[in-house]
Amino acid sequence: MKHSSEVVIAEPIEAVIPWVSDLSLYPQWMPLVHVAEALGDNAWAVELRAKVGVFARSKRLRMRRTHHDATRIVFEREELDGRKHSDLILEIELQQEGDTCRVAMHMAYGGNLWTAGVLDRVLASHIDAGKSGLARLVYRA
C-alpha cells in the first residue's frame, strides 16, 4: 500500500521542519499516529491507529529517522527483535515556494494490516486529515 498527500502552508520551511522531523509531535496533527514516544538515537515507539466506524485497527512498531536534511525527512520501521517485519516508510518532502512551503507526505506499507481495501481508504483518509492538522499547528506556533 502506498499513499501520498500534499499541503501548501503559508509559512517558511523553517516553521514546518520542527513539526515533521519529530515523531513525538505527530499525535498533535496526524490522526493516524496515536502515540509516539522518543526512545533516543532518532527512534520512536509508535502506535498507529485507524478507526472504521466503531472498530479500530492498531499497530505498534519502532520507527527510526534514517534521513534528515533541509528538504527531506525519512522514517523507517526498524525493529530490534531480530525477526523479519513488513516495511513501513514515511517520507516527508519540503519545498520552499516563495512565501509558502509545500509539504509532500509519502507512506509505503508492505504488510497486510491495512490492505483490506476499505482499510486502505481509511488509512489514506487519516493521512489526508493530517494535512489540515499540520497547517493549524504551524500557523499557531
Locations of regions flagged by a protein language model:
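Hydrophobic ligand-binding cavity/cleft-lining segments
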Residues: M1-A43
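Glycine-rich portal/gate segments that line the openings of hydrophobic small-molecule binding cavities
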Residues: E37-E79, R136-A141
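Hydrophobic pocket/interface hotspot
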Residues: V16-V20, Y26, W44-V46, R65, ...
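Solvent-exposed residues in well-ordered beta-strands and their adjoining turns
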Residues: V8-P12, E47-K51, T66-H68, E93-E97, ...
